[in-house]
Amino acid sequence: KFIESLIVGYEVSSRLGTASRPRKNVHSHGHWGTPGAAVAVAKLSDYSANDMRSIINISTSMSPANSWTPCFEGATIRNAYSGRSGFQGILAVHMYEAGFTGIHDAPSDIFGSILGDAFEPDKAVLGLGDIYRIQQPGP
């Protein structure tokens, strides 16, 4: 069950990343990890697909906005981006349990207009069910 949850979280993160075009000045480490972590926790907790949709919308609204400047200046805060993303994903599930709601289509809003220049939902679901992204070789 843990491995399945991990794979589902990775799949969501990867697919959101594929569908997004981050702004040039935005460091994307952590963006897609927040909903990925949230989905992994939700899957591990046996939430329904409808619950996960709500959790994705909450967690996407919590995705960190990071710039590239710390990388260029050598600031070590950049090392916390991915970990903070995981923490916020876990927090999103607890917030859902406490009754918080997100906007209807947070990925399109957050990744398509705030952290990015475009979000293409069709790319997020292209080939869904054919092969898991974790099985695909890198570039």
What are these regions (language model features)?
Residues 28, 32-34, 39-139:
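Functionally critical mobile loop/hinge segments
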Residues 1-38:
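A glycine-rich phosphate/pyrophosphate-binding beta-strand-loop-alpha-helix module
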